């Protein structure tokens, strides 16, 4: 389909809390939306993408988890599509560095739940429960935050906020 422009930090749509979508209403255009999200995420080498990062107001996110690939073969990914996702359970705590396609060049240590349970619809409109830990848990939390109008830097240590703001000002000069 199409590689879309990535919405950047400071654009209003990134701060909108997206409402759940009606799957039956969405279904006729879902394949095209998912293909655009897939193509865009792969083009920018992202691990995940929310619909509002390409300017859409649908409560949809997509995540790519690297699979074990035999040596010499191209990297393969397991794709997760979550529609109307809600985190229903969180356990543990882990700190790791995060970045975002909407804030290119910025990496910040962020604290997240170590494992989560998410209720959502899959791309066929069926209800699913995802039990996630590790990178998948982190990526789901990051993308669901986007759908809730939050950005990963909202979770940063408050002492780092002035430094993050300064770095964002510098980086944003290079964003197109």
Curated annotation (Swiss-Prot):
GO terms for biological process: co-translational protein modification; translation. Its cofactor is Fe(2+). This is Peptide deformylase. Belongs to the polypeptide deformylase family. The active site is at residue 143. Its EC number is 3.5.1.88. InterPro entries: Peptide_deformylase, Peptide_deformylase_sf. The keyword Isomerase does not apply. Removes the formyl group from the N-terminal Met of newly synthesized proteins. Requires at least a dipeptide for an efficient rate of reaction. N-terminal L-methionine is a prerequisite for activity but the enzyme has broad specificity at other positions. GO terms for molecular function: metal ion binding; peptide deformylase activity. Binds 1 Fe(2+) ion. It catalyses: N-terminal N-formyl-L-methionyl-[peptide] + H2O = N-terminal L-methionyl-[peptide] + formate. It comes from Elusimicrobium minutum (strain Pei191).
């Amino acid at each position: 389909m199409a590689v879309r422009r990535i919405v950047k930090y400071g654009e209003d749509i990134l701060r909108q809390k997206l409402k759940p979508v009606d799957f039956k209403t969405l279904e006729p255009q879902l394949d095209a939306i998912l293909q655009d999200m897939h193509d865009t995420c792969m083009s920018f080498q992202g691990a995940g993408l929310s619909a509002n990062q390409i300017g859409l107001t649908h409560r949809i996110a997509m995540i790519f988890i690297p699979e074990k690939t035999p040596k010499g073969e191209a990297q393969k990914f397991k794709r997760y599509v979550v529609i109307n996702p809600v985190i229903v359970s969180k356990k543990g705590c882990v700190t790791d560095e995060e970045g975002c396609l909407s804030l290119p060049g910025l990496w910040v240590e962020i604290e997240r739940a170590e494992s989560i349970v998410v209720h959502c619809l899959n791309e066929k409109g069926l209800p699913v429960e995802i039990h996630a830990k590790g990178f998948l848990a982190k990526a789901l939390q990051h993308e669901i935050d986007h759908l809730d109008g939050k950005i990963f830097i909202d979770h940063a240590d408050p002492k780092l906020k002035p430094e993050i703001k300064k770095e964002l000002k510098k980086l944003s000069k290079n964003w197109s």
